[in-house]
Protein backbone atom coordinates (compact mmCIF):
# COMPACT_ATOMS: atom_id res chain seq x y z
CA UNK A 1 0.00 0.00 0.00
CA UNK A 2 1.28 3.45 -0.84
CA UNK A 3 1.32 6.37 1.52
CA UNK A 4 0.58 9.96 0.56
CA UNK A 5 1.27 11.88 3.76
CA UNK A 6 4.03 13.92 2.12
CA UNK A 7 2.06 15.21 -0.86
CA UNK A 8 2.89 18.82 -1.51
CA UNK A 9 5.91 19.25 0.75
CA UNK A 10 8.70 19.51 -1.86
CA UNK A 11 8.32 23.16 -2.83
CA UNK A 12 7.86 24.58 0.70
CA UNK A 13 10.83 22.54 1.94
CA UNK A 14 12.96 23.75 -0.97
CA UNK A 15 12.03 27.35 -0.19
CA UNK A 16 13.09 26.83 3.42
CA UNK A 17 16.38 25.26 2.32
CA UNK A 18 17.07 28.13 -0.09
CA UNK A 19 16.45 30.70 2.65
CA UNK A 20 18.62 28.78 5.14
CA UNK A 21 21.52 28.25 2.73
CA UNK A 22 21.29 30.80 -0.11
CA UNK A 23 24.80 29.97 -1.31
CA UNK A 24 23.85 26.37 -2.10
CA UNK A 25 21.85 25.10 -5.06
CA UNK A 26 18.40 23.80 -4.16
CA UNK A 27 16.65 21.17 -6.24
CA UNK A 28 13.14 19.97 -5.39
CA UNK A 29 11.47 16.88 -6.86
CA UNK A 30 7.68 16.75 -6.99
CA UNK A 31 4.89 15.01 -8.80
CA UNK A 32 2.30 17.13 -10.55
CA UNK A 33 -0.49 16.05 -8.21
CA UNK A 34 1.44 16.79 -5.03
CA UNK A 35 2.74 20.07 -6.42
CA UNK A 36 -0.84 21.31 -6.80
CA UNK A 37 -1.23 21.16 -2.99
CA UNK A 38 1.23 24.05 -2.53
CA UNK A 39 1.44 25.67 -5.97
CA UNK A 40 0.85 29.13 -4.45
CA UNK A 41 4.27 28.91 -2.78
CA UNK A 42 5.73 29.64 -6.20
CA UNK A 43 4.87 33.27 -5.43
CA UNK A 44 7.10 33.15 -2.34
CA UNK A 45 10.07 31.86 -4.32
CA UNK A 46 9.51 34.57 -6.93
CA UNK A 47 9.10 37.36 -4.38
CA UNK A 48 12.33 36.32 -2.65
CA UNK A 49 14.08 35.53 -5.98
CA UNK A 50 15.24 32.19 -4.65
CA UNK A 51 17.30 29.98 -6.90
CA UNK A 52 14.99 27.00 -6.46
CA UNK A 53 14.82 24.47 -9.28
CA UNK A 54 11.65 22.40 -9.19
CA UNK A 55 11.82 19.17 -11.18
CA UNK A 56 8.20 18.28 -11.81
CA UNK A 57 7.27 14.69 -12.67
CA UNK A 58 4.18 15.21 -14.83
CA UNK A 59 2.11 12.05 -15.23
CA UNK A 60 -1.16 13.96 -15.08
CA UNK A 61 -2.34 12.64 -11.77
CA UNK A 62 -1.72 10.94 -8.48
CA UNK A 63 0.04 7.87 -9.86
CA UNK A 64 0.75 6.14 -6.53
CA UNK A 65 -2.84 6.51 -5.40
CA UNK A 66 -4.03 5.48 -8.88
CA UNK A 67 -1.95 2.31 -8.53
CA UNK A 68 -3.49 1.60 -5.12
CA UNK A 69 -6.95 1.66 -6.68
CA UNK A 70 -5.76 -0.66 -9.44
CA UNK A 71 -4.13 -3.04 -6.93
CA UNK A 72 -7.39 -3.21 -4.98
CA UNK A 73 -9.38 -3.72 -8.18
CA UNK A 74 -11.34 -0.61 -7.25
CA UNK A 75 -12.63 2.05 -9.62
CA UNK A 76 -10.34 5.05 -9.96
CA UNK A 77 -11.76 8.22 -8.44
CA UNK A 78 -10.15 11.65 -8.22
CA UNK A 79 -6.69 10.53 -9.26
CA UNK A 80 -6.38 12.02 -12.73
CA UNK A 81 -5.21 15.62 -13.14
CA UNK A 82 -5.48 16.73 -16.73
CA UNK A 83 -6.94 20.22 -16.71
CA UNK A 84 -3.83 22.25 -16.00
CA UNK A 85 -0.70 23.39 -17.81
CA UNK A 86 2.11 23.33 -15.21
CA UNK A 87 4.44 25.50 -17.27
CA UNK A 88 1.81 28.18 -17.86
CA UNK A 89 1.08 28.21 -14.13
CA UNK A 90 4.79 28.50 -13.30
CA UNK A 91 5.30 31.31 -15.81
CA UNK A 92 2.29 33.07 -14.28
CA UNK A 93 4.20 33.11 -11.00
CA UNK A 94 7.30 34.50 -12.75
CA UNK A 95 9.24 31.26 -13.02
CA UNK A 96 11.33 30.21 -15.99
CA UNK A 97 10.39 26.81 -17.42
CA UNK A 98 11.75 24.03 -19.57
CA UNK A 99 10.38 20.67 -20.69
CA UNK A 100 12.03 17.25 -20.78
CA UNK A 101 10.51 14.48 -22.90
CA UNK A 102 13.51 12.15 -23.32
CA UNK A 103 15.88 10.82 -20.61
CA UNK A 104 18.95 12.37 -22.25
CA UNK A 105 17.42 15.83 -21.95
CA UNK A 106 17.16 15.79 -18.15
CA UNK A 107 20.75 16.45 -17.03
CA UNK A 108 21.32 19.36 -19.44
CA UNK A 109 17.96 20.90 -18.53
CA UNK A 110 18.65 20.73 -14.80
CA UNK A 111 22.19 22.08 -15.25
CA UNK A 112 20.90 25.00 -17.33
CA UNK A 113 18.16 25.73 -14.78
CA UNK A 114 20.66 25.73 -11.91
CA UNK A 115 23.04 27.99 -13.81
CA UNK A 116 20.32 30.48 -14.73
CA UNK A 117 19.54 31.52 -11.16
CA UNK A 118 16.09 32.46 -9.99
CA UNK A 119 13.18 30.06 -9.73
CA UNK A 120 12.91 27.53 -12.55
CA UNK A 121 10.63 24.56 -13.25
CA UNK A 122 11.94 21.60 -15.24
CA UNK A 123 8.88 19.61 -16.29
CA UNK A 124 9.40 15.93 -17.08
CA UNK A 125 6.54 14.68 -19.23
CA UNK A 126 5.92 10.96 -18.64
CA UNK A 127 3.11 8.61 -19.68
CA UNK A 128 0.05 8.79 -17.45
Regions found by a protein language model. Name each.
Residues 1-128:
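Thiamine diphosphate
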Amino acid sequence: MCSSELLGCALPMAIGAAIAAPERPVLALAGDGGWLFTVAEMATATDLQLGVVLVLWDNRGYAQIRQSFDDADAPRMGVDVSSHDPEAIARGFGWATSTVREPGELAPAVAAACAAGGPHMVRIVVPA
